[in-house]
């Protein structure tokens, strides 16, 4: 899909292992809708609180927010939806939403979409289940890229790499200069997926990447082995002990000028920078590997809101979702969290930071868009296979054959199941 088509309007203006109580819904009264939130980090948590406060003032209804640590929410979502979920909850567009729609765990909100304004047809498609019905209210998106500090590149005389060879050469030079080339943390299991996605799309193309994640290509193919081999060649330039470090801790080393680069999404590094230093944060697109694919594809996940099938206050949930679909709701959120991009074409982009404007240009110029590994594939495959596989690779990068054979074996088991 063309990302330009998806966000043209905006540019203009899981198996559970923890206790069920981790994701137990709040008990709501007759005037309150409950909302399951995975926004546990300080910046988005505050921004969402402002948006919900605005809704409460406007509607004279209450929103009871049940905030759960982001990773716990992700990993326990299946049990949550089958148990006693909140009326509304935060989740993602694309395959990860479609999977739960197909399982009958989401409520159809097509009637709300008939009155929505400011969303492109392609955004609607990303919010639509396999049955052709709409389930998601999209809220914002953010691209993944290679982030760095402008002052470090200026002081050291570094050039922005366009090719993978230049990327490796830059990493070698940073290491010689006493920097950790790549700040890197994968304790939560998903951050390293962004690096895999870009390596695969740059080496094998977007179509191969999506087909692989949908179970249509073999993980033990020469193409996938090449991806892990390319990654293995970069690992000497990554922070050691990534599986014991959070992405927040990794991003802090970029802010402290101890590391030179990091592959993350737009909201992530900025949250670790002080307000005074935020203007020094910059990014460049992940470099080209195969000229046939260039830098065509961009990873730019879309986040939003869903209504659970078991919602108790259905009218309240629909009323809240209708508000969250407005430019007003997005403007309020982005005022407190300038690390994302609005999806509604009516949102106010005049106050966008230079980094937000650059992110819009990056995504608008993309020929294809991916959502993210754990959103473009089945959640059970991402959670039970790929998190462990990538972390195993980071610990033992020399057994690529054994790694991909094991992934392929588990893929066949999962994708053949109903």
Describe each PLM feature range.
Residues 1-98, 103, 160, 243, ...:
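Conserved N-terminal structural module of periplasmic/extracytoplasmic solute-binding proteins
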Residues 79, 86-87, 116-151, 180-183, ...:
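A structural signal for short loop-to-beta-strand junctions that line the ligand-binding cleft
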Residues 92-144, 195-197, 282-284:
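Hinge/lid segment of periplasmic solute-binding proteins
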Residues 173, 213-243:
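Glycine-centered hinge/linker elements that transmit conformational signals in sensory
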């Amino acid at each position: 899909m063309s990302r330009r088509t998806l966000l043209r309007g905006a540019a203009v203006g899981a198996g559970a292992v923890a206790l069920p109580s981790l994701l137990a819904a709040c008990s709501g009264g007759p005037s309150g809708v409950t909302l399951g939130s995975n926004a546990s980090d300080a910046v988005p948590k505050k921004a969402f609180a402002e948006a919900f406060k605005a809704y409460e003032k406007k509607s004279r209804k209450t929103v009871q927010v049940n905030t759960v640590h982001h990773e716990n929410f992700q990993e326990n979502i299946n049990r949550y939806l089958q148990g006693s979920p909140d009326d509304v909850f935060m989740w993602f567009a694309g395959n990860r939403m479609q999977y739960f729609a197909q399982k009958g765990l989401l409520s159809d909100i097509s009637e709300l979409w008939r009155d929505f304004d400011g969303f492109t047809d392609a955004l609607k498609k990303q919010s639509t289940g396999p049955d052709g019905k709409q389930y998601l209210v999209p809220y914002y998106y953010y691209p993944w890229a290679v982030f760095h500090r402008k002052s470090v590149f200026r002081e050291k005389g570094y050039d922005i790499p366009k090719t993978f060879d230049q990327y490796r050469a830059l990493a070698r030079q940073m290491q010689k200069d006493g920097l950790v080339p790549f700040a890197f943390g994968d304790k939560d299991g998903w951050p390293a997926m962004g690096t895999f996605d870009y390596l695969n799309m740059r080496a094998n193309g977007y179509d191969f990447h999506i087909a692989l994640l949908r179970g249509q290509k073999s993980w033990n193919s020469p193409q996938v082995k090449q991806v892990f081999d390319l990654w293995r060649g970069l690992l000497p330039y990554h922070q050691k002990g990534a599986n014991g470090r959070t992405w927040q801790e990794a991003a802090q080393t970029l802010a402290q000028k101890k590391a030179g680069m990091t592959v993350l999404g737009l909201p992530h590094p900025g949250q670790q920078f002080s307000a005074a230093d935020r203007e020094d944060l910059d990014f460049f697109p992940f470099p080209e590997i195969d000229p046939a694919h260039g830098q065509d594809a961009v990873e730019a996940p879309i986040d939003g809101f869903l209504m659970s099938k078991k919602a108790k206050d259905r009218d309240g949930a629909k009323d809240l979702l209708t508000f969250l679909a407005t430019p007003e709701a997005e403007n309020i959120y982005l005022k407190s969290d300038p690390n994302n991009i609005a999806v509604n074409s009516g949102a106010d982009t005049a106050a966008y930071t230079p980094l937000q404007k650059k992110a819009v240009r990056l995504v608008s110029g993309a020929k294809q868009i991916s959502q993210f590994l754990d959103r473009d594939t089945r959640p059970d495959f991402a959670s039970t296979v790929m998190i462990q596989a990538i972390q195993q690779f980071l610990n033992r990068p020399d057994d690529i054959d054994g790694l991909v054979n094991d992934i392929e074996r588990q893929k066949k088991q999962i994708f053949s199941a109903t």
